[in-house]
A protein has these predicted regions:
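PLP-dependent enzyme catalytic core of the Aspartate aminotransferase-like
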Residues: 1, 174, 317, 330-355
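Conserved beta-loop-alpha segment that forms the PLP phosphate-binding cup at the N-terminus of a helix
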Residues: 68-71, 83-109, 232
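PLP-dependent aminotransferase-like
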Residues: 101-155
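Active-site phosphate-binding strand-loop segment of PLP-dependent enzymes
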Residues: 136-193, 197-199
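PLP-dependent aminotransferase class I/II
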Residues: 214-288, 292-294
């Protein structure tokens, strides 16, 4: 017996963990600085960590009330109804729910290149076909509706990442609205705002109230520091919000995840500290790195270093783990997550010795 043909599928390439790298290099994990996975340099929201400890004895129960409470809290934050908040086990889980709700076998999706690999992965899991539109380095990764529409051919879902990973560029709210206006009525524009808290631009959630063809993805992984908990959500139009009951994996957002999410929402000081820290780190890298960088609205900076793989491997040997962006189709670049001041300064010092 064999699985179905998976030849069109590609494996997701995550950044390597500290323990894994330390074992390979024979180093103390405590001596390494990991700036490769866009994790929160300041850790989880303290109130969330406290909630995880407090509710650990309750993990034998299903997250019925906590999930409902979290949907209500998020609905209040975004001025939508609880039914419009689709909780999931991470942003990728929310992508799967949207694919389940929207895609019939053979339906097409349009994804950016470079971009988040899971958009295409999720579509293919649900028997969709995948086309791409370019976000070009030669154009400083500018994102416009027109650039997407040049490659649009009636796809059922169009994915926009704003801020974009790995470049940090954004698509403005007016451009998202233009894209939704000029695609077919049955095309859904999904705006992935995983890094939205780090941006000064308004969220595309503002469009959800007035239209039925835009959905927005958000996560607790980045600004809230809960990547290991796996908690994300989509905000969808009210017209088809009730589809959630028919497409969601039961209890996929765990009791611990929901309790942590509720507590994190009640800890705005941590988000503010995280965002301000990222803003400082971005500027420090722009000013101090001896290589070309692109302005970013995320918690990371894309750097052109010549040979991304060689520089990333050399930095790793010096105890600084950064992301080689070859898998994004940018072999001449690396991506550096915003660390604490000490981490960022060390990374810049090491990288400047290598470029």
């Amino acid at each position: 017996m064999e699985p179905r043909d998976l030849s069109a599928h590609v494996a997701y390439e995550a950044g390597r963990g500290v323990e894994e790298v330390a074992r390979d290099l024979g180093l103390d994990p405590e001596s390494l600085v990991k700036l490769s996975s866009n994790e929160n340099a300041y850790g989880p929201a303290p109130k969330a960590a406290e909630a995880i400890r407090e509710y650990a004895p309750n993990v034998h129960t299903y997250p019925k009330s906590s999930a409902a409470d979290l949907r209500e809290a998020l609905a209040e934050q975004w001025a939508v109804t609880p039914s419009q908040v689709w909780l999931a086990n991470g942003g990728d889980g929310a992508l799967d729910y949207l694919a389940r709700a929207m895609l019939d076998p053979g339906d097409g999706v349009l994804v950016s290149k470079p971009g988040f690999a899971y958009y295409a992965m999720s579509a293919r899991y649900h028997h969709g076909t995948v086309s791409e539109y370019p976000i070009r380095k030669s154009e400083d990764f500018e994102q416009t509706a027109e650039a997407v529409l040049q490659h649009y051919d009636g796809e059922r879902i169009v994915y926009v990442t704003s801020p974009h990973n790995p470049s940090g560029s954004e698509m403005s709210l007016s451009e998202v609205e233009k894209l939704a206006d000029e695609t077919d009525e049955e095309t859904l524009v999904v705006v992935d705002e995983a890094y939205g808290e780090f941006s000064d631009s308004p969220s595309a959630v503002a469009l959800v109230e007035e239209r039925d063809d835009v959905a927005v993805l958000r996560t607790f992984s980045k600004a809230y520091g809960l990547a290991g908990v796996r908690l994300g959500y989509a905000v969808v139009p009210g017209e088809w919000a009730d589809a959630y009951a028919r497409v969601n994996t039961p209890f996929a957002a765990s009791e611990i995840a929901c309790r942590a999410g509720l507590a994190a929402l009640d800890d705005p000081d941590h988000v503010e500290k995280t965002v301000e820290g990222a803003r400082w780190a971005r500027q420090y890298m722009y000013d101090e790195l001896d290589c070309h960088t692109w302005e970013s609205s995320g918690n990371f900076v894309l750097c052109e270093v010549g040979e991304g793989t060689a520089v990333a491997e050399a930095a790793q040997r010096e105890g600084v783990i950064v992301r080689d962006t070859t898998s994004f189709g940018l072999p001449e670049c690396i991506r550096v997550t915003c660390g604490t001041r000490e981490e960022t300064e060390r990374a810049v010092e090491v990288l400047n010795e290598l470029v």
